[in-house]
From Swiss-Prot:
UniProt domain tr-type G: residue ranges: 8-268
Name of protein: Peptide chain release factor 3
InterPro entries according to UniProt: EF-G-like_DII (IPR053905), EFG_III/V (IPR035647), G_TR_CS (IPR031157), P-loop_NTPase (IPR027417), PrfC (IPR004548), RF3_C (IPR032090), RF3_dom_3_sf (IPR038467), RF3_GTP-bd (IPR041732)
Top-level taxon in the UniProt lineage: Bacteria
Cellular component GO terms held in the UniProt record: cytosol
GO biological process: regulation of translational termination
Disulphide bonds in the chain: none
Described function: Increases the formation of ribosomal termination complexes and stimulates activities of RF-1 and RF-2. It binds guanine nucleotides and has strong preference for UGA stop codons. It may interact directly with the ribosome. The stimulation of RF-1 and RF-2 is significantly reduced by GTP and GDP, but not by GMP.
Gene: prfC
Organism field: Streptococcus pyogenes serotype M1
Homology family: Belongs to the TRAFAC class translation factor GTPase superfamily. Classic translation factor GTPase family. PrfC subfamily.
Length: 514
């Protein structure tokens, strides 16, 4: 098969949702259909011994939450599918946002009882900004939920995207009977031995069933007043195809997967800082690091840089340019994933996600190129911390483990490190409290380094230039520090302290992001 044909087989997408909408469960079912697991791990309770395949970190298994993006790959129906299962918890939005830079489409999972929730809206806005296609799966039809028409209306009003139902539920909760499949023009049956039936048999199958009569009325209304189906509008991110189903009972998921792969886009190009778009079908290899993960194999204390291949083909042992440093690197120890499981690969193509063994060479956002190509892809999003804590080792004899743990976990990008300019104390910044809990858990579990964490009462951070640096600017309301790149910053206790500082030192430029 030619390189072009291989690239065109790739379908790379992320699954996004509010916590507990069923995102990880649907991921499990997709892996089941892809033949990667024998049964979906539908149990996520910490008292059970069965856990979601994509939740590989100990804290995820203990607390039943996803706190890091997982990468999974399988072959299905002639396509190579790359799934990125993202954390739904808002504290980990930075990891999720970066992951969304590495995909060509998104699957948005919505709880039928709750509709569009806060985190779903946040993540959708990122996807919308990139104009990538969004496929919607309205989940939990095996439970009572809101009316389908109401859910479609909310999609359009809250998210501002047109919708087109690919199927329609017949009943809900205990009265759930199946799906009226508008795209494939058939009925998908929830009960009984037969999985499908023709639409012509519907009146006989559901004789005197008020829910089926309501379905026919709803569909007639949609055909008269609903949006027209347009494959181009889907690819442009202007129309979301909507699928109903139940991930927990694995109903409607395979139909969704089949139809998704029919309309999901091939790998797309990425913009460089100069405004050019790198064609995925170009011969020369290029890619970017969108995530760094330490201790995927705790026995070896390793670190993996996740790279989205943008163009060309990776071959084992190839040399690349690391544009940020201007130095070369050799890609020899490279893997692909099934959550924490991995296997060595000798080649991969545009659209694929590979893991490069990292000894400290790479940073999130790095661009990799070959030959004379020295461009950089557009920078990944960064976030300003809102909570700060002092951190120190509980046992001074564990200094070495403490420093190694901090170095590796900070490089993942979910938490930021600062060092007090005057005292040398370490301080951490995060978007949410859960990030500190995960940090503490991982320091103790993965590095055997217990830590003491103390709230600081600081709420925001601003960067300044070296030229403006003056230690006399420090006061009780702000702390002068350096970030992990040795750039000077001020940590302020509140917005009032920030405004007071800006008024007192009008010539000092305060940057919200480095």
């Amino acid at each position: 098969m030619s390189l072009t044909e291989e690239i065109k087989k790739r379908r790379t997408f992320a699954i996004i949702s509010h916590p507990d909408a069923g995102k990880t469960t649907i991921t499990e079912q997709l892996l089941y259909f892809g033949g990667e697991i024998r049964e979906a791990g539908t149990v996520k309770g910490k008292k059970s011994g069965t856990f979601a395949k994509s939740d590989w970190m100990d804290i995820e298994k203990q607390r039943g939450i996803s706190v890091t993006s997982s990468v999974m790959q399988f072959d299905y129906a002639g396509k190579r599918v790359n799934i990125l299962d993202t954390p739904g918890h808002e504290d980990f939005s930075e990891d999720t946002y970066r992951t969304l830079m590495a995909v060509d489409a998104a699957v948005m999972v919505v709880d039928s009882a709750k509709g569009i929730e806060a985190q779903t809206k946040k993540l959708f806005e990122v996807v919308k900004h990139r104009n990538i296609p969004v496929f919607t799966f309205i989940n939990k039809l095996d439970r009572d939920g809101r009316e389908p028409l109401e859910l479609l209306e909310e999609l359009e009003e809250v998210l501002g995207i047109a919708s087109y139902p690919m199927n329609w539920p017949i009943g809900m909760g205990r009265a759930f009977e199946g799906l009226y499949d508008l795209h494939n023009k058939r009925l998908e049956l929830y009960k009984g031995d037969e999985r499908f039936a023709s639409i012509e048999d519907g009146d006989q199958l559901f004789a005197n069933n008020p829910f089926y009569e309501q379905v026919k009325e709803d569909i007639e209304l949609l055909q008269e007043a609903g949006n027209d189906f347009s494959e181009q509008a889907i690819l442009d991110g202007d129309l979301t195809p909507v699928f109903f189903g139940s991930a927990l009972t694995n109903f409607g998921v395979q139909t969704f997967l089949d139809t998704f792969l029919e309309f999901a886009p091939e790998p797309h190009g990425h913009k460089t800082t100069e405004g050019n778009v790198v064609d995925p079908l170009a011969k020369d290899f290029s890619g970017f690091v969108f995530k760094i993960q330490a201790n995927m194999d705790p026995k070896h204390r390793d670190r993996i840089a996740f790279v989205r291949i943008v163009s060309g083909e990776f071959e084992r042992g190839m040399g690349v340019n690391l544009t940020r440093t201007g130095k070369g690197a050799k890609l020899s120890n490279v893997t692909q994933f099934m959550a924490e499981s991995r296997e060595n690969v000798t080649n991969a193509v545009a659209g694929d996600i590979i893991g490069v063994y990292d000894t400290g060479t790479y940073q999130v956002g790095d661009t990799l190129t070959v030959g004379k190509n020295k461009f950089e892809f557009e920078p990944l999003p960064t976030f300003t911390p809102e909570i700060f804590m002092k951190v120190s080792p509980k046992n001074v004899m564990k200094q070495k483990s403490f420093h190694k743990g901090i170095e590796q976990l900070v490089q993942e990008g979910a938490i930021q490190l600062y060092k007090n300019y005057q005292t040398g104390e370490y301080m951490l910044g995060a978007v949410g409290q859960l990030q500190f809990e995960v940090f503490k858990h991982r320091m103790e579990g993965e590095y055997n380094a217990e830590v003491v964490m103390t709230p600081m009462g600081k709420k925001t951070v601003r960067w300044i230039s070296e030229d403006d640096l003056d230690q006399r600017m420090s006061s009780s309301r702000n702390i002068l520090a350096k970030d992990r790149f040795d750039q000077p910053v001020f940590l302020f206790e509140n917005d009032f302290a920030l405004r007071w500082f800006a008024d007192k030192y009008p010539d000092v430029t305060l940057e919200e992001k480095m």
